[in-house]
Amino acid sequence: MVFLLCFFLVADVSYGINKDCLLPKVVGFCRARFPRYYYNSSSRRCEKFIYGGCGGNANNFSSYYECHIKCFGPRAIIFPEDSPKEN
């Protein structure tokens, strides 16, 4: 039981996460349609969204890779099944 508790405390990805990654997704108020990624703190994943081009916040990344590196650090990258791998 103690082992499981320690495992979950260490495995919590929000521990030490970049504060920008905890900001909410903001689509922006302009009408452009830029595909972007943000860190979803509920699902604990980088997810795709459509950015309007202005407004927004720092939780807005041009690629899945950029989001993952910024929010998880230089760990192994796991690409979602529905996204192509980015170079």
Swiss-Prot record:
Domain of life assignment: Eukaryota
SMART domains: KU
Site (Reactive bond): 31-32
Location(s), subcellular: Secreted; Nematocyst
UniProt entry keywords in alphabetical sequence: Disulfide bond, Ion channel impairing toxin, Nematocyst, Potassium channel impairing toxin, Protease inhibitor, Secreted, Serine protease inhibitor, Signal, Toxin, Voltage-gated potassium channel impairing toxin
Domain BPTI/Kunitz inhibitor: 21-71
GO terms for cellular component: extracellular space; nematocyst
GO molecular function, one term: toxin activity
Keyword Membrane: no
Cleavable signal peptide: 1-16
Disulfide bonds: 21-71, 30-54, 46-67
Presence of keyword Cell membrane: no
InterPro entries documented for this protein: Kunitz_BPTI, Kunitz_BPTI_sf, Prtase_inh_Kunz-CS, TFPI/VKTCI-like
Pfam annotation, one family: Kunitz_BPTI
Major localisation: secreted
Propeptide positions: 76-87
Miscellaneous section: Negative results: does nos affect the inward-rectifier potassium channel (KCNJ2/IRK1), as well as Kv1.1/KCNA1, Kv1.2/KCNA2, Kv1.3/KCNA3, and Kv1.4/KCNA4.
Family as reported in the entry's similarity comment: Belongs to the venom Kunitz-type family. Sea anemone type 2 potassium channel toxin subfamily.
Name listed for the protein in its UniProt record: U-actitoxin-Avd3n
